[in-house]
Amino acid sequence: MEKLPDAEKLKWIKAADDEMKSLKELETWKLTELPEGKQAIGCKWVFKIKHDSEGKTDRYKARLVAKGYSQKFGEDYDATFAPVVKQTTLRTLLTIAAVRNMKVRHYDVKTAFLNGDITEDLYMSQPEGYVANGKENLVCKLTKSLYGLKQSARAWNTKINEVMLSNGFQQSKADQCLYSKFEHNKWMYVLLYVDDLIAVHEDDDAIRQFGDLIGDHFAVKDLGEISYYLGIQIERDISGNFLLNQSVKIAALLDEFNLNDAKGVSTPMEAAYMKAEGESDLLPDNELYRKAVGALLYVATTTRPDIAAAIGILCRRVSNPRQRDWNAVKRVMRYLKQTISLKLKISADNNLELVGYVDADWGGDVSDRKSTSGYLYMIGQSSISWSCKKQVSVALSSTEAEYIAASYASQEVIWLRQLLDDLGVAVNQPTLIYEDNQSVIKLAVSDKINTRTKHIDIRHHHLRDLVDRHVINFVYCETNNMIADVLTKPLPRSKLEELRTYMGLIY
């Protein structure tokens, strides 16, 4: 920090002062002598510039972080698990909000982790730059959780969960970060991601009352109508549709990997990539490859299902990538550059029916001839859940590959139906799943065992049970209209553009 210009340095000093003020107000620690036999963990300052939805500087943030890596299990901490919201839950909630014309407001809990209580005796050295005069020999006995501690996330989640439940909210069985309350014949939903809260209700007054309620327990900042969440830019058009995109994230990736001047392409992956392994040199260091694929995977699972198949394929190479694989990664980025303004539309059309599409690319991986499963679930015209996954065994026929894919997709539908039930959306009818293989449909509704299918793992036959219990029902779909095809393999430009439009990706 000493090398920074004075104006810049002052901003960071003020940020650190603000952090210390919050720590003192919450009585995060007490100065004391270190008991014999105890060891004080260290701490450090972490500085970060926060950006808004347009990527511009919002504020300077300084955070005091405990060096939790030196904690000892069973002595300094025990349980550490804390739930994290699923992206599918966010898209589902926004779909319901769009259809019912509900308001969606964003709140940020300041220094959230500092509100959690800890029960262990933990001691920490005094923070650099803020050592108490004349008390240099003392240490901090922690009374509240602090960022960096092993148990901090769990302690905060326990605290906010207590507040929600004590005020009449029900925690979702499908997603522990989702809360709901039915009051005065109207629903309120709250979605929690660490210290970010989304409140959803028909009335502004009800949302403001919720903001006041949370403000009674924690220091809260009202960020207004939702516009930026988990790296996603969210806008609402005049028809009430939500439009999700990650252009800021994509632009940052292009800059990080020096592809700002690269030529855009119209497809994320060439079909020829899958047809042969090809000979090329091993990458000397696969760290850059892993970093790029990881970043692209987040984009693929959040707002861009059109690149999910390409990224799923490239993820298979992370342990031993070659130059051709790295070229394929860069091609995905070039595709994102050309389509950076694509947005995932969450439709306000009056339709909350859950439907699914499932497909498989039989033996598409030439390295081992294993197939790829792909599924897409939509509520009305909104894509809420999708996946691309390589199958673990070699399918002996296209029917077997499609049947395994259908089995995989059916696991998601059970969870989705529970999620909708938690949100008060009726799911009394079987969920329709579109399938383009007639033999799979016959196999799913029949208990016959023949020579061609007797070897199929029994675990996949839970499909029949779901059909018998009227949880799902398969409907034939012509191959040309199978949307999930885009989630199983690289497609030519014309087909890709057609299917991504059906998925709700629009300019």
How should these model regions be labeled?
Residues 1-507:
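Long, low-complexity, charge-biased intrinsically disordered regions
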